[in-house]
UniProtKB/Swiss-Prot annotation:
NCBIfam families: PRK00147.1, queA
HAMAP family in the cross-refs: QueA
Gene for this chain: queA
Species: Thermosipho africanus (strain TCF52B)
Any GO BP: queuosine biosynthetic process
Keyword NADP: no
GO cellular component: cytoplasm
Identification of the protein by name: S-adenosylmethionine:tRNA ribosyltransferase-isomerase
Catalytically driven reaction(s): 7-aminomethyl-7-carbaguanosine(34) in tRNA + S-adenosyl-L-methionine = epoxyqueuosine(34) in tRNA + adenine + L-methionine + 2 H(+)
GO-annotated molecular function: S-adenosylmethionine:tRNA ribosyltransferase-isomerase activity
Length: 335
């Protein structure tokens, strides 16, 4: 398949710049893959589409305040975006302007807090060594909001899910942003089960596909962990004929990664799984997700799940009906 097969027209004003308030008041497009039907609801109505015995699989990663600002000894300003922790005090990061940060460059973040560029990494990234603890670093950091969000004053807690626990992502698993504690309680009371996993979202989420033949695209690898309790719940749900419902594409990618590995009690590692049509989903029965960028790997994933033509029809309908798109936008439930 070609990259151009996954394009659609999106007016810029439909890119959400602020989150819905309350979280579960965003709109919800419900897509039935078998019947090819489209319904328009509010996110909290999702309770009506979920059944006792369904398993909701959530990514409990927590976003770090990964965007930092500093100055070189020359006085030139530098922006740093943390990508992944390598060891104590050492991070892989993107720097702007990259041409100004070479091996040995020192950057001052605040009084007594500085960083030295130790080496070059893949695709323009740098290996940086900080002289402070992570806690101090995160005190200085800002929310790493995606570049298409012009409103950089979105409160940091609104870019975290209410169930986030494990620090390590540079972008939110945004499908989870729609859930409130009250909505989760309603789902529990209805007899739904919850299972948690971790995939620390890296910058690959926003990396554009630059090749027309999508099979040539290489995904950035991301670290994941699926605990034994979650593996057990997944197997029990399968045995009892319940549905496995992935909250977000990060949960989908983790589930479909472990589905291709030998049976284990728990799973951890790095995944660079790239899901595009045609693809056999082995563990995912339904997906809760946001509306994704044209020509993005995430759009390809939902196209693989629901069929490319049906997804593009749904997206064109969403544009006509002025749904809000991307990270802070509205949601889709695809089953």
């Amino acid at each position: 398949m070609k990259l151009s097969d996954f394009d659609y027209y999106l007016p810029e004003e439909l890119i959400a710049q602020t989150p819905a308030e309350p979280r579960d008041s965003s709109r919800l497009m419900v897509l039935n893959r078998k019947e090819k039907t489209i319904e328009h609801r509010i996110f909290r109505d999702i309770v009506e589409y979920l059944k006792p015995g369904d398993l909701l699989v959530r990514n409990i990663t927590k976003v770090i305040p990964a965007r930092l600002y500093g100055v070189k000894e020359t006085g030139a300003r530098v922006e740093i975006l943390l990508l992944e922790k390598i060891s104590e005090g050492v991070w892989e990061a993107l720097v702007k302007p990259g041409s100004k940060v070479k091996k040995g460059t020192k950057i001052i973040l605040s009084e007594g807090v500085e960083v030295i560029c130790k080496d070059y990494s893949q695709q323009g990234a740098r290996i940086l060594e900080f002289n402070c603890s992570d806690d101090k670093l995160f005190e200085l950091g800002n929310a790493p909001l995606p570049p298409y969000i012009k409103n950089q004053k979105v409160p940091f807690e609104r870019y975290q899910t209410v169930y986030s626990k494990e620090t390590g992502s540079v972008a939110a698993p945004t499908a989870g942003l729609h859930f409130t504690e009250e909505l989760l309680e309603r789902l529990r009371n209805k007899g739904l089960e919850f299972a948690d996993l971790i995939l620390h979202v890296g910058l690959g989420t926003f990396r554009p596909v630059k090749v027309e033949d999508i099979r040539e695209h290489k995904m950035h690898s991301e670290r994941y962990y699926v605990p034994a309790e979650t593996v057990k719940k997944i197997r029990e749900t399968r045995k009892n004929k319940g549905r496995i419902i992935a909250v977000g594409t990060t949960s989908v990618r983790t589930l479909e990664t472990i589905a291709r590995l030998p049976n284990q009690e728990s799973y951890h590692g790095k995944t660079d799984i790239f899901i595009y049509p045609p693809f056999e989903f082995k563990l995912t029965d339904a997906i809760i997700t946001n509306f994704h960028l044209p020509k993005s790997t995430l759009l390809m994933l939902v196209a693989a799940f629901a069929g490319k033509d049906f997804i593009l029809e749904a997206y064109n309908t969403a544009v006509k009906m002025k749904y809000r798109f991307f990270s802070l936008g509205d949601a889709c439930f695809i089953y």
